[in-house]
């Protein structure tokens, strides 16, 4: 299979590029990206670095820009810090965490490989959407999993999911966008684990709210409100109104990312701007 060579990016002169992995509880934040009149994860990290003498650092860049309420289990990011920054790299996660609130944690830090860009070098993004499938809600999962009181047909949901995997036009499942809407969906799988269900979603890039629209549609299938075979027709229609509604953001987690050679076969055709696909 043919492959593209990875595109190379370098920090500005006088800066060292670091690669960090960060996790956060999205309930406290208006999303990843810094914005006025709201607390963001990006701004929270910058404040912690400034406390360590890193005022000259550029803004951190993440593999994906999550919306308000969305969590991250392992979000890669790069951070260009001045070469004069003196905190030893081995101590940086602990030092940052001492200044960060309990809802954000730096899990690891290293010097980024040459040419690494957290957003543009990313070849696969993984998400998990969590459901609490039980007659009664559970307080420990409030804002962390969607409560579904009725039974769900996992087998039907996975049949519908299989019909969506691959290179397709996903306009029917995403918030309306002006740019092209073809994406390569690498994984869509429902995994029940007792009352806690995980829906795994993976691809190089996603349209705005696409993951939440896919999950909302699978929920209709699981509830018997939509036939598994009907999902292919919804996909072909490109009509957002025919698919399920976006599920709430609190059940969505950015689970991880991969970096490697980007595939030519099955590419979304929009690999240059994966990080603009906010909200999932």
From Swiss-Prot:
<dbReference type="GO" id="GO:0009982">
    <property type="term" value="F:pseudouridine synthase activity"/>
</dbReference>
<comment type="function">
    <text>Formation of pseudouridine at positions 38, 39 and 40 in the anticodon stem and loop of transfer RNAs.</text>
</comment>
<dbReference type="InterPro" id="IPR020097">
    <property type="entry name" value="PsdUridine_synth_TruA_a/b_dom"/>
</dbReference>
<feature type="active site" description="Nucleophile">
    <location>
        <position position="67"/>
    </location>
</feature>
<comment type="subunit">
    <text>Homodimer.</text>
</comment>
<comment type="similarity">
    <text>Belongs to the tRNA pseudouridine synthase TruA family.</text>
</comment>
<keyword id="KW-0819">tRNA processing</keyword>
<dbReference type="GO" id="GO:0003723">
    <property type="term" value="F:RNA binding"/>
</dbReference>
<feature type="binding site">
    <location>
        <position position="127"/>
    </location>
    <ligand>
        <name>substrate</name>
    </ligand>
</feature>
<dbReference type="InterPro" id="IPR001406">
    <property type="entry name" value="PsdUridine_synth_TruA"/>
</dbReference>
<dbReference type="GO" id="GO:0031119">
    <property type="term" value="P:tRNA pseudouridine synthesis"/>
</dbReference>
<keyword id="KW-0413">Isomerase</keyword>
<dbReference type="Pfam" id="PF01416">
    <property type="entry name" value="PseudoU_synth_1"/>
</dbReference>
<dbReference type="InterPro" id="IPR020095">
    <property type="entry name" value="PsdUridine_synth_TruA_C"/>
</dbReference>
<dbReference type="InterPro" id="IPR020103">
    <property type="entry name" value="PsdUridine_synth_cat_dom_sf"/>
</dbReference>
<dbReference type="GO" id="GO:0160147">
    <property type="term" value="F:tRNA pseudouridine(38-40) synthase activity"/>
</dbReference>
<dbReference type="InterPro" id="IPR020094">
    <property type="entry name" value="TruA/RsuA/RluB/E/F_N"/>
</dbReference>
<protein>
    <recommendedName>
        <fullName>tRNA pseudouridine synthase A</fullName>
        <ecNumber>5.4.99.12</ecNumber>
    </recommendedName>
</protein>
